[in-house]
């Protein structure tokens, strides 16, 4: 990956949206590698749009009206979003490096920038409005008046720390009274009764913006004066290249393409404090030019307290969707770590009951604090009453779970890889014991398990030892932090699991 930027004088930004026009966009989304089909199914289900899976793994493309941008940002399976300017499925690169780079420069003025920039501008305005709404309702009436012992208002950091400690001690019974410590990632909505209202408001905002004369592009920041907003936009070009038959590097492509963008728009380049990020994605002979719609990955939406191996929320969603949760299902993550899987499950499948557990007290504490943050997201706007989530966390031993035999519908967990946590040697004893205990608590015939591991050899051996309890139904190959891992979907057989001594 490479980025390029340059300097330029003032110039025009993207033009206004035409009044009454129905603006459409082709959206590109990066998704966890291996879960492209899962993401496509979510897009079809929630947006009614068919998706095309890119030959470059980890990307999908779909067309939506621009007014649907709020729903696009609420997709659970996507990491980053961008609007496609143009796509070339079989771009012919010149063998000579100078000629190939010159072609990329000449490409800039031939691209249809107008509508994608309108979509970018609309996306920017929606982010600003959402930020203003969140700031306006970030504190409950009760917490606004709360003072400390010295008569002065408590600082936000101190309030947040106390709230998290209280919530971690009693997740089920304590309501967090403090204000929201971090803003939600753009486009996200809490899973409570107010979500529909917020969605309606965002839809109206989007429709108004599409139909309004919004003027030239503005800078994505708060406290900007009208004079500052009228200044030239700042930009950078990011090049992602894959393939060994190119005569140029990613840096060279980004540099020359960025120079042409700068000359075409007369924008000013800034590598860090930019308004527009132009994407140049090259995969062998496939070239896609786009404009980024997300500033940071949406996979960070749920976690505020990270552990050594925190699972991405988007990958957690893909694992949960793989096991097809049904209403009233009991879903257990026996090695929850920071709680990424059960928190994602509670947010997206609130009609199920989720149980998280871990043998490490620090992991349990992190999970409890992350649940506390989720409760604050769900806090009612007009009172300090928090809406609960169908989720509990407990410290336990994975090989001796305090759950009744056959009482669980689904087990979903990220097993120790033996890299940062545990060891490859310990996995040879841990994996078979885990599978046996998971088989005991799962309902015979209908129970499912979705397990992520990079220690594939050890898992295959362990599964062969418990083949009378678990049957492998599907394997999804994924990339986790550069490691080639696998997600296994197992189905519980009708075979009765070995009973053990009662826990009580």
What do the predicted segments below correspond to?
Residues 2-271:
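Non-catalytic nucleic-acid substrate-recognition regions in nucleic-acid-modifying enzymes
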Residues 60, 286-287:
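Hydrophobic residues embedded in beta-strands of well-ordered beta-sheets
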Residues 67-74, 296-299, 496-498:
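Short, charged/polar, Gly/Pro-enriched secondary-structure boundary elements
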Residues 288-324:
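SAM-dependent Rossmann-like transferase core, predominantly class I methyltransferases
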Residues 311-405, 410:
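Conserved S-adenosyl-L-methionine
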Residues 363, 370-480, 484-486:
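S-adenosylmethionine
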Residues 480-504:
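Core SAM-dependent methyltransferase catalytic element
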């Amino acid at each position: 990956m490479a980025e390029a930027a340059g300097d330029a004088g003032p110039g025009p930004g993207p033009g206004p949206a035409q009044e009454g026009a129905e603006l459409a966009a082709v959206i590109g989304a990066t998704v966890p590698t291996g879960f492209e089909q899962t993401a496509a199914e979510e897009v079809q289900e929630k947006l009614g749009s068919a998706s095309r899976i890119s030959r470059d793994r980890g990307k999908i493309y779909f067309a939506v009206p621009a007014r649907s941008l709020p729903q696009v940002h609420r997709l659970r399976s996507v990491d980053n979003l961008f609007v496609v300017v143009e796509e070339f499925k079989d771009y012919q690169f010149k063998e000579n490096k100078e000629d190939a780079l010159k072609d990329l420069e000449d490409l800039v003025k031939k691209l249809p920038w107008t509508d994608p920039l309108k979509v970018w501008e609309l996306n920017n305005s929606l982010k600003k409005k959402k930020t203003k709404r969140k700031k306006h309702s970030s504190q409950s009436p009760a917490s606004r008046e709360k003072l400390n012992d010295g008569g002065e208002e408590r600082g936000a950091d101190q309030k947040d720390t106390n709230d998290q400690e209280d919530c971690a001690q009693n997740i089920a019974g304590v309501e967090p009274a403090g204000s929201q410590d971090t803003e939600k990632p753009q486009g996200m909505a809490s899973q409570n009764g107010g979500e529909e209202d917020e969605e309606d408001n965002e839809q109206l905002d989007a429709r108004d913006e599409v139909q309004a004369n919004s003027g030239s592009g503005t800078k994505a920041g708060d406290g900007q004066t009208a004079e500052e907003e009228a200044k030239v936009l700042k930009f950078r070009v990011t090049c992602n290249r894959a393939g060994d038959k190119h005569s140029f590097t990613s840096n060279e492509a980004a540099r020359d393409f960025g120079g042409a963008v700068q000359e075409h728009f007369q924008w000013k380049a800034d590598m860090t404090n930019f308004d527009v990020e132009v994407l140049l994605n090259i995969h062998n002979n496939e070239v896609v030019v786009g404009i980024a719609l997300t500033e940071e990955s949406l996979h960070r939406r749920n976690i505020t307290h990270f552990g050594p191996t925190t699972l991405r929320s988007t990958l957690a969603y893909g694992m949960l969707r793989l096991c097809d949760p049904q209403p009233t299902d009991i879903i257990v993550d026996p090695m929850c770590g920071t709680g990424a899987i059960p928190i994602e499950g509670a947010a997206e499948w609130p009609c199920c009951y989720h149980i998280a557990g871990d043998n490490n007290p620090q992991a349990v504490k992190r999970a409890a604090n992350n649940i506390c943050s989720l409760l604050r997201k769900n806090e009612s706007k007009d009172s300090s009453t928090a809406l609960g989530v169908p989720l509990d966390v407990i410290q336990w031993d994975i090989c001796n779970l305090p759950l009744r035999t056959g009482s669980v519908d689904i087990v979903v967990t990220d097993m120790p890889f033996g890299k940062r946590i545990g060891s490859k040697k310990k996995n040879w004893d841990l994996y078979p014991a885990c599978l046996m205990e998971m088989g005991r608590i799962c309902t015979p015939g209908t129970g499912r398990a979705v397990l992520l591991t990079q220690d594939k050899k050890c898992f295959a051996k362990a599964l062969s030892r418990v083949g009378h309890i678990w049957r492998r139904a599907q394997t999804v190959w994924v990339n986790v932090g550069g490691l080639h891992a696998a997600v296994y979907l197992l189905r519980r057989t009708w075979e009765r699991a070995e009973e053990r001594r009662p826990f009580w």
